C-alpha cells in the first residue's frame, strides 16, 4: 500500500487539475462569448446564452466522442502516456482558448480540449489496476473528492484572475492584457497542467 501512495497522489492531482481547467470558465464565459460574438457581429442578448451553452457543451461532446478511444488506447499503451497526453492537451488548448479571437475558435478549441482529455476515465481505470477490492471504494472516493475540489477551485480562479488589467493593474495594465481579459485564468490552469 505504501508503494501506491505516490501514484494515488498524482492521480488525485491529475483529476484536480482537469476539473480546475474545465470549470474555471464558468465565471467569465458569458462575457467572453458576448465579446467574441459581438466582434463576429452576429449575437444579440436573446442568443448569447445559447452560445454559452454551445461552448460548454463542445468540451463534453469532445469527451463523449473520444474518451472511449482514449480508454481503449490506455489499455494498449498504458495509462501514463494517455494521462500525459491529456495534460498536454489541457495546456495547449487552455492557452488557445484564452487567446481565441472568434466564437468558432472558442468552440473548436473547447471541443479539442475535451477530445484530447480522457483523464478522468483513465484515472479510474488506473486506480482499478492498482487497487484491491477492499481499497477500491476508498480510492474512488478520493477521486470524487478531487473532482469536487477542482469544481470549487476552478470557478474561484476564473473569477479572481479575469480582467487583470482592471483588477490588478501594475504589470497587467497594458493594452495586451486589456484586449485579452480572459487569458490569465486560462494561462494559470495551463501552467498547472504543464507542471
Ranges and model annotations:
Residues 48-51, 135-142, 181:
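Cytoplasmic loop-to-transmembrane helix junctions
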Residues 108-147:
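Cytoplasmic helix-loop-helix junction between adjacent transmembrane helices
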Residues 179-195:
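Symmetry-related core transmembrane helices of the 12-TM Major Facilitator Superfamily/SLC fold
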Residues 64-103:
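Conserved MFS/SLC helix-loop-helix module at the cytosolic interface between two early adjacent transmembrane helices
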Residues 32-64:
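Extracellular/periplasmic helix-loop-helix junction of adjacent transmembrane segments
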Residues 56-68, 118, 151-152:
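Residue-level signature of mid-helix packing/kink "hotspots" within the transmembrane helices
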